[in-house]
Amino acid sequence: MSIFKRLLCLTLLWIAALESEADPLIVEITNGKIRGKDNGLYYSYESIPNAEHPTGALRFEAPQPYSHHWTDVFNATQSPVECMQWNQFINENNKLMGDEDCLTVSIYKPKKPNRSSFPVVVLLHGGAFMFGSGSIYGHDSIMREGTLLVVKISFGLGPLGFASTGDRHLPGNYGLKDQRLALQWIKKNIAHFGGMPDNIVLIGHSAGGASAHLQLLHEDFKHLAKGAISVSGNALDPWVIQQGGRRRAFELGRIVGCGHTNVSAELKDCLKSKPASDIVSAVRSFLVFSYVPFSAFGPVVEPSDAPDAFLTEDPRAVIKSGKFAQVPWAVTYTTEDGGYNAAQLLERNKLTGESWIDLLNDRWFDWAPYLLFYRDAKKTIKDMDDLSFDLRQQYLADRRFSVESYWNVQRMFTDVLFKNSVPSAIDLHRKYGKSPVYSFVYDNPTDSGVGQLLSNRTDVHFGTVHGDDFFLIFNTAAYRTGIRPDEEVISKKFIGMLEDFALNDKGTLTFGECNFQNNVNSKEYQVLRISRNACKNEEYARFP
């Protein structure tokens, strides 16, 4: 090569390096360069692949790290693709949406010229392990505060993410394995985007909260994040760890045309050959009515010989073993969390005007095990009927199911599906763990939220329903409209809570002027109650 050509090459490389250094939208990682987008208040880098495409031969397999190298600059200005799902909130008969090839991370960094690095909040979205995506959770409120870098991840949902035959051939939990691989990617790469790899907090809502708890049950989670917050969902909720997965997997096979095989390896091979849309659309065949059960496919306990197993023991057994990450954890609920799922019972039939709740009077023993997730936990029909009878007597006594008795039904759903697990989780963690365990209850009804959306009614007061707190952190127009001045204040305090949790090395947690009290080494339950204009530490000998 001539001297002239060498000088020309060096000059071009030097110019390219200067351009990259001068352009804050260009980030370079092992796979190559990434170009983001300037959104005014913040920079975004969306739809970055972190895993190989989970399609074809890689469907129903543990995710593999993304290994391709980009020769051109990767365009990270494309809106995130939602994983394929049968979405409860699509008000049409065909609820199919999304793409099977969806394993990406999206990063949002405040524009602060005088600041080069930020603590990191990783979001695990909710959706009952069946639907949802990080893209519906807004980040504008956090970006306006300008103190946190936000990462949203995608993971397999419904049958594509959680179908399981209960053996090593189709063990399940692929969605949880997707999450774990994404967390590893974030730890490795986030510094390139201005994130602090030693100051990462994982937060999730509903199924995302349960996922955060399940991730924490891996000892080496302590190397991936500094702490975790499970909002209105944890691993002990009855809808999280599923039984009956094998039966549903083979039923799925029959629905999509795999015949009546009872051999797991044959079923897996057949399912790999079917269109993803057929597999996901089969969800409708598992619904008893409306979108019940709301989680037809979810996490399972895998066999010990499963390759790349994520969970081989029940979460309670894992906690009792003490072999989980000793990092601070917060577990929360709202006073009327059960408004999710219960509110849909108030939806009127467009033809008859009758509501699902009216039909419960004749169908309670048929539907209750699906509504409250003990269909597969009970061994006999008599066991199911006995529990259904006891629950009705406990919460309604001799009252009929109706709009007038809705609050009794909602309280039942709140207790069984969300609240009862909180003291159980606290008890186990403080007995077998050493790291701080915090809890809060949110008690501040919104003007319009999930209750109104699911019921399609405005004539019923729902209280503080599922998501009324979380949607103040990640503003979500799809699930609520408007935000009051008091909620603006609460939103800022929640965001400050996340920043402090990520930055401090003492494992403490604060909300505005209130300091959370640690449940470890405490005989009483320590719960912070957050209401419209106040926060207050409450202490219970028995959980209320």
From Swiss-Prot:
Record: glycosylation sites: 75, 114, 262, 456
Keyword Secreted applies: yes
Protein name: Esterase P
Subcellular localization(s) per the UniProt record: Secreted
Subunit: Monomer.
EC numbers on record: 3.1.1.1
InterPro entries per UniProt: AB_hydrolase_fold, CarbesteraseB, Carboxylesterase_B_AS, Carboxylesterase_B_CS
Organism: Drosophila melanogaster
Organism classification: Eukaryota, Metazoa, Ecdysozoa, Arthropoda, Hexapoda
Highest taxon listed in the record's lineage: Eukaryota
Signal peptide span: 1-19
Residues forming the catalytic site: 206, 466
GO cellular component, one term: extracellular region
Disulphide bridges, residue numbers: 83-102, 258-270, 514-535
Catalyzed chemical reaction(s): a carboxylic ester + H2O = an alcohol + a carboxylate + H(+)
Family: Belongs to the type-B carboxylesterase/lipase family.
Molecular function as annotated in GO: carboxylesterase activity; serine hydrolase activity
Keywords of this entry: Disulfide bond, Glycoprotein, Hydrolase, Secreted, Serine esterase, Signal
